[in-house]
Amino acid sequence: MWQSFLIEPLTQLFLFLYNILGQNMGLAIGALTLILRLVLLPLSIPAIKAAVKQKDLAPKLAKLKGQYGSDKTGYAKAQMELMKKEGLNPLAGCLPQILQVVVLFALYKVFIDTLGKDSINTNFLYLDLGLPDQYFILPLLAAAGQLVASKIMMPAVQGGVAVASKTDDNKDDLAYNMQKQSLYLFPIMTLVVGYKLPSGLVLYWFLSTVFSAAQQVILQKVYGKK
């Protein structure tokens, strides 16, 4: 099912793009990345809406913080009830990230299968896209891009996070903890894993984060005005 549902369609799409783009694997990866980002766009919109809504809830969260003081359990419960009432899911931003990881594993299989063909040209700029980047430049760019994308997401939720960060008992604040942990989790993971992955896969990850950052900026402007 995994093979027929995801691997084979991605392989055929990638080979099609490779052939129509002058058998340039780098350009094919760029085109494939753009297509996949557009496919995942509907899943990113709820995450952006949730982030903007969380910023709007900052005054209410601050009020709750003042009401409950050192009562961490009471505040956490009230916070969850407020989020539920406002239709805010603190995990809304996780699904697109999880799906990106799933797609990354699928593309690893696609690239391994494709690179096994002698007719595929893997040269792109200074890279052999079938091998890890010996200069470690691409993994660093991918990790930096992931960090930038995460930071771009932060202003939309910063209002809610600030409520927690201004108090001594901020460890009970869900938004604060989740935002703090997720900010560096994916960049570190990208850096570590990218060290061993074929450059073609790391190139996809880098381009995907660039498109994601641009997408977040646009969507935040659109839904932040509503």
Where are these regions (language model features)?
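Helix-loop-helix
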Residues: 1-226
